[in-house]
Each structure stands twice: as C-alpha cells, then as structure tokens.
Amino acid sequence: MSVSTKRLEMDEEAEEAFDLFDVTHKGYIDFEDLRRSCAQLGENLTKEQLQLMLDLAGTNGKVSREEFAELWIHIS
C-alpha cells in the first residue's frame, strides 16, 4: 500500500469519526458534542476531563474538521 493510499484511508476514517461526533453538522466538535459522544460510548467523564480533552487538542473549545484530522493522524 502506498503512502498516499494509506493517507487517503486515514482521511476517510477521520471524516467518518468526525461525523460521529458532529451529529448536528456544525463543522466542529464542541464540549456538548464530546460529552454526548463519550456518554453514548459508555464513558462517563467529568466536565473537567472533557474540557481537558478539548484543551489538549489546542483549540478554543471547538475542534474543526481539519484539526480533528490532524489529531487523528497523530493517534493512528
């Protein structure tokens, strides 16, 4: 598999994952999106833990599609 093919597959996976969080299709993931998604996955995180996740993403409380894709690449 070529590097560009692998990158394309990662981009598609990131897009699908982003859409699971951004259920209202705002174009970004905010605190409420993160809270709801984690709860649906059975992860009952505190407000502080959720906020820390957003802070670690280096955002202003909103994770854009592009920022999410960059994070996805680093954790994949």
UniProtKB/Swiss-Prot annotation:
Transmembrane segments: none annotated. The keyword Nucleus applies. One of its GO terms (cellular component) is mitotic spindle pole body. Pfam families: EF-hand_7. One of its GO terms (biological process) is spindle pole body organization. Residues 9-44, 43-76 form the EF-hand domain. It comes from the Eukaryota. It is found in: Cytoplasm; Nucleus. The keyword Repeat applies. Keywords: Calcium, Cytoplasm, Nucleus, Repeat. GO terms for molecular function: calcium ion binding. CDD domains: EFh. This is Uncharacterized calcium-binding protein C1687.14c. The lineage of its organism: Eukaryota, Fungi, Dikarya, Ascomycota, Taphrinomycotina.
